[in-house]
């Protein structure tokens, strides 16, 4: 086994189409990563420069956070790929449980009095 270390390895078993697909996927992930950095900078700049009115700042940042969360789920957690039916079902059911719970807590605690 140690004698074979000086020999070069065989080419990968990937086809040219698979290599193109992987390169395309890497490009997509880089673009999405840059978009998420842009969204983060946009939320920081919106607060730091007072461009957004105070009454709209929190909803604006929340909207950007939801967009960023969706991008992370679909591109970096690979939820857009097939065979993730159970994971998608759990995520959707979690959202349907979380949103009414947060809304009820806001009403109960009186947080909506801004």
UniProtKB/Swiss-Prot annotation:
Q: Is the keyword DNA-binding in the record?
A: no
This protein's name: Cytochrome c oxidase subunit 4B
Q: Where in the cell is it found?
A: Cell membrane
Supply one GO CC term from the record: cytochrome o ubiquinol oxidase complex
Keyword annotations of the record: Cell membrane, Membrane, Translocase, Transmembrane, Transmembrane helix
Q: What is the lineage of its organism?
A: Bacteria, Bacillati, Bacillota, Bacilli, Bacillales
GO process annotations (BP): aerobic electron transport chain; electron transport coupled proton transport
What is the E.C. number? 7.1.1.9
Q: Which gene encodes it?
A: ctaF
